[in-house]
Amino acid sequence: EVTKPETINYRTLKPEMDGLFCEKIFGPSKDWECHCGKYKRVRHRGIVCERCGVEVTESRVRRHRMGYIKLAAPVSHVWYLKGIPSYVAILLDIPLRDVEQIVYFNCYVVLDVGDHKDLKYKQLLTEDEWLEIEDEVYAEDSTIENEPVVGIGAEALKQLLEDLDLNQIAEELREEITNSKGQKRAKLIKRIRVIDNFLATNAK
């Protein structure tokens, strides 16, 4: 986890520990050399320095090792949103343009219909439509006890993804694939491949 905004120490010109270029997280900046200099050269390959916690390996590992930061609010990663195919759209079974409407705060999405008869789960609503529904729900003569819940932005997508039961969806898709043909079958196969990868790696 990256916990500091610093990049490089201006005195030593070495990456700051726990910063954006941290050697402990991403790997050494020089081949076969730890941060503190205790271990140098290839003979120490694979050793993790007990003093600075940096693994003695090639510096090129920095190109693919990834860290993470904790944010105040969820955001969607552009690789999974805009990539081809869009994994978020495939998992949620929602068209990419609708997913973008939610992420970019253009539309609300229904997370729970409550007692409202005209709403559907994952339905998109404009701000005006949601204001109308709110007026209806909170009217004095309203018969709605369980209020509908809507969300917007990446936080709403996070909630939709958390609501997915991947094992159950995989089972249903396998049954559906046996009775499907053509383009529909290809779409279902694409979706089950993504779900199977999540299940195989136990990703969350």
Swiss-Prot record:
Textual note on the cofactor: Binds 1 Zn(2+) ion per subunit.
Job of this protein:
DNA-dependent RNA polymerase catalyzes the transcription of DNA into RNA using the four ribonucleoside triphosphates as substrates.
Q: What class of enzyme is it?
A: transferase
Catalysed reaction equations from the record: RNA(n) + a ribonucleoside 5'-triphosphate = RNA(n+1) + diphosphate
Q: Which UniProt keywords apply?
A: DNA-directed RNA polymerase, Metal-binding, Nucleotidyltransferase, Transcription, Transferase, Zinc
Q: Which GO terms describe its biological process?
A: DNA-templated transcription
Which SUPFAM superfamilies does this UniProt record tie to the protein? beta and beta-prime subunits of DNA dependent RNA-polymerase
For the keyword Transferase, the answer is: yes
Which Gene Ontology cellular-component terms appear in the entry? DNA-directed RNA polymerase complex
Q: What is its EC number?
A: 2.7.7.6
Where on this chain does Zn(2+) bind? 34, 36, 49, 52
List the lineage, top down: Bacteria, Bacillati, Cyanobacteriota, Cyanophyceae, Synechococcales
Name the chain's protein: DNA-directed RNA polymerase subunit gamma
Organism, per UniProt?
Prochlorococcus marinus (strain DV1)
Give coiled-coil spans as residue ranges: none
Q: Return one GO MF term.
A: DNA-directed RNA polymerase activity
Family according to the record = Belongs to the RNA polymerase beta' chain family. RpoC1 subfamily.
Q: Which InterPro entries match?
A: DNA-dir_RpoC_beta_prime, RNA_pol_Rpb1_1, RNA_pol_Rpb1_clamp_domain
The domain of life is Bacteria
Assembly and interaction partners? In cyanobacteria the RNAP catalytic core is composed of 2 alpha, 1 beta, 1 beta', 1 gamma and 1 omega subunit. When a sigma factor is associated with the core the holoenzyme is formed, which can initiate transcription.
| Cofactor(s) essential for the protein | Zn(2+)
